[in-house]
């Protein structure tokens, strides 16, 4: 799954614990895939005891209840990152909201993506 393509910007929200709110910015890249997104997030996270917690969500087209998150097969390395796929109710089924969150809860990002 591509997180976005060149014609679609990525809407990024970054959680700032100090201000206790999300800050937003919109940006685009020629090719921004899931692996790149994960690496980009992980390099900006604080590790907790040298590890990241791992949680995997399912794309919304595979989730019966729109707000339910289920585990994916272990296709990503354990102790790497927290990633969840949430539906975006105001967009068509091809659009996802990805939520990245470090296990120490000090860093989180959200991307609105096209699947």
Curated annotation (Swiss-Prot):
Domain of life: Eukaryota
Protein name: Uncharacterized protein encoded by LINC01619
């Amino acid at each position: 799954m591509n997180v976005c393509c060149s014609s679609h910007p990525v809407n990024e929200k970054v959680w700032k614990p100090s201000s206790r709110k999300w800050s937003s910015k919109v940006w685009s890249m020629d090719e921004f895939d899931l692996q790149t997104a994960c690496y980009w997030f992980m390099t900006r996270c604080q590790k907790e005891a040298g590890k990241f917690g791992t949680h995997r969500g399912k794309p919304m087209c595979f989730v019966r209840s729109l707000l339910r998150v289920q585990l994916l097969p272990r296709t990503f390395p354990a102790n790497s990152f927290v990633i969840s796929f949430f539906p975006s109710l105001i967009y068509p089924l091809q659009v996802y909201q990805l939520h990245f969150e470090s296990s120490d809860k000090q860093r989180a990002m959200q991307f609105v993506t096209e699947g």
